[in-house]
Amino acid sequence: MQHNRISSPASMLADPTRAAIVLALMDGRSRVAKKLALDAGVTPQTASAHLRKLVAANILACEARGRFKHFRIAGAEVAHAVEALSELGAAAGRTLPPAAHELRFARCCYDHLAGRLGVAITERLPLLGSGVLAELGIDLDALESQRRPLSRCCVDWTERRPHIAGSLGAALLRAYKDRCWLLAIEESRKLVVTPRGRAMFVERFGVDEALFAAS
């Protein structure tokens, strides 16, 4: 039935342990079951049972590397759905947990930038010329030839406004990291803006300097 296409994946994420496991993987990296058990605060046996269900539901993908299995988000569409569900929870009036405040300014949303900085850049993009993207080594024609959509709006669960996803969103985040404008934090979705990154986001993208002062 049509409603099963919604209810089945939603029921997978309704369980707090499975939700914690999926959210731990929203930085786009893969992890072993033992680490995900620690992230979710459960035993390895319990985590393994939940991981099997998430893989069977095509929410997570599993890859064997030597003796260990590594788990990751199954794809961009899954990450987009998880972010949308997170935004629905925020819109329902739930208070953000303390850990979420650390992620609010800049974080990975699977393979693109989210948070206040991600939203601010997204709002500035239509005002910028293609030269800014070219300076970052981003080839729009090459991105448009991919099967993945060039851009799409991903509603930010902390800001409740859209940030850019799609192949362009992923290319932008890669460019920021390659130029050390943003630094990833190990085992976290949080991204740190470097002094050079702050200067470049203000100079090249026109992001308000006050945004960084308030972070």
Predicted segments with their positions:
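Key DNA-contact positions within bacterial/archaeal DNA-binding proteins
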Residues: Q45, R52
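N-terminal helix-turn-helix DNA-binding core of bacterial DNA-binding proteins
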Residues: N4-T43, K69-F71, C108
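Basic, amphipathic "hinge/linker" alpha-helix immediately C-terminal to the N-terminal HTH DNA-binding motif
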Residues: E63-L88, G197
